[in-house]
Amino acid sequence: FVYPFLMRSGSRMPVLVMLLAIGFNALNAWVNARWVSEYGTYPVAWLADPRFWLGLLLFAGGLTLNARSDRTLRRLRSGGGGYRVPHGGGFRYVSSPNYLGEIVEWTGWAIATWSLAGASFALYTIANLAPRAMANHRWYRDTFPDYPADRRALLPYVL
């Protein structure tokens, strides 16, 4: 959600797309906050549960991968001169490490909260970003003849 505001681009985002994104994020925030604050029962012992720690580690790792990958993409655009192939970090393995990071991030949230609300958002994130990652990968391969042949779309060595 923050990424478009960090980019300096001559292209415009359609108002409907922006409003739908804001609406979805507001609904998601409300559903997850409501679950955690009213419906979820988290005793203090939950903080020692392996699911909480695994979820927290996945969330932090996904957030880091997402932020670093977005920074790499922003730096590519800052120099002007058209599109270029990103390199380094998660881009060594996949075309859309920012999407992979976001998927890992929200999967971690789902595990840490052990909730239907968290799982629903993780599944939505996968359903939304996996096809976009595949489309980005096709675009890179079609646009750049020397695009790394061993780079996958979303999952290193797999997809």
Please place each PLM-identified region on the residue numbering:
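Hydrophobic alpha-helical cores of multi-pass transmembrane domains in eukaryotic membrane proteins
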Residues: 1, 19-30, 57-64, 107
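Internal transmembrane alpha-helix with an interfacial aromatic "cap," most often the third helix
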Residues: 1-15, 28-40
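Short capping loops/turns at secondary-structure boundaries
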Residues: 9-19, 47-50
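Long, highly hydrophobic alpha-helical transmembrane signal-anchor segments
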Residues: 22-54
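Hydrophobic transmembrane alpha-helices
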Residues: 41-159
